[in-house]
Amino acid sequence: MIDKHLSSQFDADLESVCAQMLEMGRLVKMQVTDAMDALNHLDAQAAQRVMRNEQRINTLEIDIDQECSNIIVRRQPAARDLRLLMAISKIITDLERVGDEAEKIAVCTQRLTQAGAQPHLMDGSALKQAGAMAISMLHRALESFMHLDTAATAQIVRDDCVINEAFHAFVRTLITYMKEDTQMISTGLDYLSAAKAIERIGDHATNLAEFTIYIVKGTDVRHISPEQLAQEALC
C-alpha cells in the first residue's frame, strides 16, 4: 500500500506506522469481540478482561500519533504521503474511541451481572445482530485501509444504516419489556447504554472507511449523505 520513495528509510517509516495502526486496529477489534461475547453471555470475568486491556489501546494511540508527527517533521511529506499520515492520526482517534465503547459495553455487562440479569430474560437478537455487524464493519474498514480499496467502503456505509435500524428495533423491544415489568427498567437502561455503544462503533467504522477514500482520492467525504459517500467510493 506504500508508494516507493528514493529514501528507503522513508518507506520503512511509513510501513512501520501503518503496521502499528493495523495492530492497534486488531486489538480494538478483539476488544469489541470480547465485549460482545461478555454481553451476550453476561460473563463478568470476560467483561473485566476487556476493561483491563483498555489502557494498552490508549498507549498505542499516543505512541502512533507521536510517530506520525515525527515523520511529518523529518520528511515533510506531500500529496498522498501527507494524506496517509494525517488520516492515520485521525483513524487512531476513532480506534481509541471504539475501545472506549467496548469498555462501556463491558461496564454495562458487569452491572447487569451484579443485578442478577439472565441472558434469556429478553429477546436480544437485534442487539446481537448489531454487534456482529459492527465487528464485521470494523474488520472490513481495516482491510479496506490495508489494501486502499475504496470500493469496499461503499458496503460499510450501507451497513451502518443496518446497525442503526437494528438499534432502533432493540430500543422498541426494550420499551415493551420495561412497560410490562417496571423491575426491568434498571436492566433495560444498561442494555440501552450497551446498544448505543454498538451503534457508535458502527459510526466509527464508517469514519475509518471515509479516511481510506480521503487517502486514495484526496476527497473529504465527511458530512455528506450515505448515498453520496457510496457513490464517491465506487467512482
From Swiss-Prot:
Signal peptide from the UniProt entry: none
Compartment(s) of residence: Cytoplasm
GO CC aspect terms: cytoplasm
Record-linked Pfam families: PhoU (PF01895)
Main localization of the protein described in the UniProt heading: cytoplasm
Keywords per UniProt: Cytoplasm, Phosphate transport, Transport
GO biological process: intracellular phosphate ion homeostasis; negative regulation of phosphate metabolic process; negative regulation of phosphate transmembrane transport; phosphate ion transport
A GO molecular-function descriptor: protein homodimerization activity
Domain of life: Bacteria
Quaternary assembly: Homodimer.
Role according to the record: Plays a role in the regulation of phosphate uptake.
The family this protein is said to belong to: Belongs to the PhoU family.
NCBIfam families named among the record's database cross-references: phoU_full
Protein name as catalogued: Phosphate-specific transport system accessory protein PhoU homolog
The organism of origin for this protein: Burkholderia sp
Gene that this sequence comes from: phoU
